[in-house]
Structure formats: structure tokens, C-alpha cells
């Protein structure tokens, strides 16, 4: 299997967009990208706007070759809406080009979902219906494409158990004896059953969102950080390569905060590192890029 990270925080944007190719099917996972309107009470830097456009173009190019699009949940950095959105670099035509002639495997729009995401899901489905594409709600389901199998988890919390941020779907893709797990927004994982679901899949490669340490003491507790570190250490000791990115890399000091994880295994890296690129933590360094440190 060929795995191409398209957009992650280490590449300068909010995203976990990934292209996964097997001999049977090409899958575009979580095709969304965004940058936050405010960080440190500052607007995006010029470098962030450029990175947003670059990743959007990468996602659109990847969509040209994809047969299947998967959507783990309905935050805008994980799917592309049928609306004009400046901070997501998209409009109606962007979405049409992305989803046209694809099979969309997506999280259920009304079950295990909060009000905000339910509204976004409803709008997305309206757009897909107008476009006339096929879609299925994938929660807990399995889909076969030749010797390739896509297996979705039951809904997992978007971080700690009881979070108001809703639920996400984990995705396992297998081809013969090769196994990849894409675990969007599990924030560590913090939630024990999310870790167990990943470990039971016995992955060669895991793409996972780390804990949002930039929110520590505000929307993310020290207790949850301890759980995330413990679970990540266990994951690092029992799986192959781990691409650890997304929420975690919104923090300038992410390596120090998760030093125990990086000491556990040499196989933990950011998407940029796996691609052989220099990390671009543009959101984390917005204050310095804006000259207002």
C-alpha cells in the first residue's frame, strides 16, 4: 500500500487528509483543511494562507485519482462543505470536483453526533444528493474492494469520554497482510476503548491525532494528558510506524510535553518527517511569524 499524507499540522495547516492506494482501490481519507481565524488573538500569517492553498490543491489533485472518500466526522478540517469558506479555501465547485463520481463512506449524520456536526452533516448530504453521488453511513461497517478491506469503528469520542465535541470513526485499511489505521481526532487516544480498538487491528502504520496540549488547563486537563501519554506509550510499544500529528503539533513544545512517548520508540514521527520535509508549525508559531511575539 502507498500512503501519502496530504495535510497535517506539521505541513502548516489543520488537517489529517491522507491518500491511501492499494492495487484494488484508492481512498481519500478526511479530505478537509483549514486554518483558524484567530490564534494568540492574531489572524493567519501569509505563510499560513500559502500553506492552506497548497494543501487544498493537493487534496483536489488526490481526489482526481480516488475511488472512495471517507469522512470520520464533520469538522471542517476533516471534510469539504458545499459552501464558500475562506479559512477552508473552498466553495461549491471545490466540493463538486472533490466528491463527483466517488463512493462516500461517512459517519452517520444523526446518531452519536452533536448539534453542530449534525447541521454540517445535513448540509453535506444535501450537496451529495444534488450531485447524485453514492454514499453510505459507515459506522461499524466493513467494505471489500477486491483484496482490500475498509473497516470502520463504532463511533469513538472526539477525545475524552463525555466530550461535547461529538464522535469520530476510526478506519482500518487492509490489503493482504498490510494494515493501516487512520484515527482522526481521538486526541491521544485519551479514551481507553479507542486505544484497544486500534491495538486489536494490529497495524503496521497508525496515523493518529495527538492530545491538544495547547489547550492544557483550558479545555484539556492534566489528567487527560496523563491518559494520552500512557496510551500512546502502549501504542508505540506494540505497533509499527506511528504518524503522530494534528492537535499535538499546535503546540511549540509538543516534543517536550510528550517526551516519554518519543523515548518509547524511534518509530514515532510527524507527517512532515515521514515525508522527509521540514516541519512547518505555522499555527503554533503565528505570534512569531506575525512579529508580535
UniProtKB/Swiss-Prot annotation:
InterPro entries referenced in this protein's UniProt entry, alphabetically: RibonucZ/Hydroxyglut_hydro, UPF0173_UPF0282_UlaG_hydrolase, UPF0282_hydrls
Protein family membership: Belongs to the UPF0282 family.
PANTHER family named in the record: UPF0173 METAL-DEPENDENT HYDROLASE MJ1163-RELATED, UPF0282 PROTEIN MJ1629
HAMAP family for this protein: UPF0282 (MF_01406)
Protein name: UPF0282 protein MK0213
Amino acid at each position: 500500500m502507498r500512503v501519502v499524507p496530504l495535510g497535517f499540522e506539521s505541513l502548516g495547516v489543520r488537517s489529517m487528509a491522507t491518500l491511501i492506494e492499494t492495487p484494488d482501490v484508492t481512498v481519500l481519507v478526511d479530505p478537509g483543511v483549514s486554518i483558524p481565524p484567530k490564534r494568540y488573538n492574531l489572524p493567519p500569517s501569509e505563510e499560513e494562507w500559502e500553506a492552506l492553498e497548497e494543501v487544498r490543491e493537493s487534496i483536489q489533485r488526490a481526489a482526481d485519482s480516488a475511488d472512495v472518500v471517507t469522512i470520520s466526522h464533520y469538522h471542517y478540517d476533516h471534510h469539504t462543505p458545499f459552501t464558500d469558506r475562506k479559512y477552508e479555501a473552498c466553495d461549491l465547485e471545490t466540493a463538486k470536483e472533490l466528491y463527483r463520481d466517488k463512493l462516500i463512506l461517512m459517519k452517520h449524520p444523526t446518531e452519536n453526533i452533536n448539534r453542530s456536526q449534525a447541521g454540517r452533516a445535513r448540509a453535506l448530504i444535501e450537496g451529495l444528493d444534488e450531485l447524485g453521488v453514492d454514499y453510505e453511513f459507515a459506522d461499524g461497517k466493513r467494505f471489500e474492494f477486491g483484496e482490500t478491506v475498509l473497516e470502520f469503528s463504532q463511533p469513538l469520542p472526539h477525545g475524552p469520554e463525555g466530550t461535547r465535541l461529538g464522535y469520530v470513526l476510526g478506519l482500518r485499511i487492509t490489503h493482504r497482510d498490510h494494515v493501516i489505521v487512520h484515527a482522526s481526532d481521538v486526541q491521544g487516544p485519551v479514551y481507553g476503548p479507542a486505544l484497544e480498538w486500534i491495538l486489536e487491528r494490529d497495524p503496521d502504520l497508525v496515523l493518529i491525532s495527538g492530545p491538544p496540549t495547547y489547550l492544557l488547563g483550558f479545555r484539556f486537563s492534566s489528567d487527560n494528558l496523563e491518559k494520552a501519554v500512557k496510551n500512546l506509550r502502549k501504542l508505540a510499544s506494540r505497533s509499527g510506524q506511528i504518524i503522530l500529528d494534528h492537535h499535538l503539533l499546535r503546540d511549540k513544545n509538543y516534543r517536550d510535553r510528550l517526551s516519554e512517548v518519543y523515548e518509547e520508540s524511534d518509530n514515532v514521527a510527524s507527517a512532515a518527517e515521514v515525508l522527509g520535509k521540514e516541519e512547518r508549525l505555522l499555527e503554533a508559531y503565528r505570534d512569531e511569524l506575525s512579529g508580535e511575539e
